[in-house]
Amino acid sequence: MIQLRSVLDVADNTGARKAAMISRKGQITATAGVGDIITVHIKQSSTEATVKKGEVHKAVVVRTKAPVRRADGSYLRFDSNAVVIIDPTNNPRGTRIFGPVARELRAKNFMKIISLAPEVL
């Protein structure tokens, strides 16, 4: 699970490298899992980025280090915590997604992210 102030990798080509979670949409609890929409603060970005350091954006969690339990009893776990920055219509701001994403995004209607991802686990 991702908590408040957790530093996450950004898995798209918006130019942001690291982002910190500052809130979760629609919930009082301060934790987030795969497929949750969160608000992030950009901690580190490249010089020619479309999003700059210090900006606040919405993002969706695509990978977590904490295991995700599936209906068949199996668990899925990634090596890093990662997010994809999204616009107000829940479409990704970038045009590429780096690394695998969880299949649970399909159930939460993030089809554009699923189609851009190189691998869906």
From Swiss-Prot:
Pfam families: Ribosomal_L14. GO terms for cellular component: cytosolic large ribosomal subunit. Coiled coil: none annotated. NCBIfam families: rplN_bact (TIGR01067). Binds to 23S rRNA. Forms part of two intersubunit bridges in the 70S ribosome. Belongs to the universal ribosomal protein uL14 family. This is Large ribosomal subunit protein uL14.
